[in-house]
């Protein structure tokens, strides 16, 4: 992350929806700085750090994460990813690649939503067995879609690989053996983590493996750097 910042990424001080964005910014060697907001402790989980400025940033749809790049002010995590990716030709080139990008982008968000609902549910322990029972079927679909390709759009790295890496990693933390039956997914994870800029970031002080979720979550809410 360069000190000569041009972009500003705003989000909670967790991985959450911003991890894939951070990875893409690092991979593309984009100059940026972060504005991290802290959620208060239980029982109130005070969000005033964010709420005090939420409507003062001139955002069309005020929310986290946001990206400020000069006159361009963007919310929605996938819109931010696409904005960065377009600058580096990472949205797919052929029609087939673009179709695969669109499919996996939305499939990942469905997958992420399921995990988020589980992690924030007061019935977390009750619902966890069903999630774990259905997880292999979910992962099998990703494995079959990837097939023998190096990346999820084909043989060229696109922004959806950053999204997919993140959700697979979250599930790998949730259930450490979940990828064992899917060698192509494990190879994808290794391939992604071996990218020079990604490897450097994951080994840096800027990266924290946890918390994935905010403090009111039932899982993934503890800091582990």
UniProtKB/Swiss-Prot annotation:
Reactions the enzyme catalyzes: RX + glutathione = an S-substituted glutathione + a halide anion + H(+)
Effect on the protein of changing residue 120 to F: Strongly increased catalytic activity
Cellular localisation: Cytoplasm
Cross-link (Glycyl lysine isopeptide (Lys-Gly) (interchain with G-Cter in SUMO2)): 54, 73
Binding site for glutathione: 11-12, 50-54, 63-64, 76-77
Predominant subcellular localization, coarse grouping: cytoplasm
Family annotation (PROSITE patterns): GST_CTER, GST_NTER
E.C. numbers: 2.5.1.18
PTM comment: The N-terminus is blocked.
Pfam families for the chain: GST_C, GST_N
Signal peptide bounds: none
Function text: Conjugation of reduced glutathione to a wide number of exogenous and endogenous hydrophobic electrophiles. May govern uptake and detoxification of both endogenous compounds and xenobiotics at the testis and brain blood barriers.
Subunit structure: Homodimer.
PANTHER family: GLUTATHIONE S-TRANSFERASE (PTHR11571), GLUTATHIONE S-TRANSFERASE MU 3 (PTHR11571:SF133)
Protein name: Glutathione S-transferase Mu 3
């Amino acid at each position: 992350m360069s000190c000569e910042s041009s972009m500003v990424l705003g989000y909670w001080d967790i991985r959450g929806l911003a991890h894939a964005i951070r990875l893409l910014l690092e991979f593309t060697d984009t100059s940026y700085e972060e504005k991290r907001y802290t959620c208060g402790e239980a029982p109130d989980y005070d969000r005033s750090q964010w709420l005090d400025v939420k409507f003062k940033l001139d955002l069309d749809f005020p929310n986290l994460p946001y990206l400020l790049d000069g006159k361009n002010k963007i919310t929605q995590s996938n819109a931010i990813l696409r904005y960065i990716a377009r600058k580096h030709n990472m949205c797919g080139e052929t029609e087939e690649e673009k179709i695969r990008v669109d499919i996996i982008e939305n499939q990942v968000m469905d997958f992420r939503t399921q995990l988020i609902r589980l992690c924030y549910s007061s019935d977390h322990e009750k619902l966890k067995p069903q999630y774990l029972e259905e997880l292999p079927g979910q992962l099998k679909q990703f494995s079959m879609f990837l097939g023998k390709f190096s990346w999820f759009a084909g043989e060229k790295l696109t922004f959806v690989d950053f999204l997919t890496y993140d959700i697979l990693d979250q599930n790998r933390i949730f259930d450490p053996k979940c990828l064992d039956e899917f060698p192509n997914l494990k190879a994808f994870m290794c391939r992604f983590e071996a990218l020079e800029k990604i490897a450097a970031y994951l080994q840096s002080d800027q990266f924290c493996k946890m918390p994935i979720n905010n403090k009111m979550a039932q899982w993934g809410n503890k800091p582990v750097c």
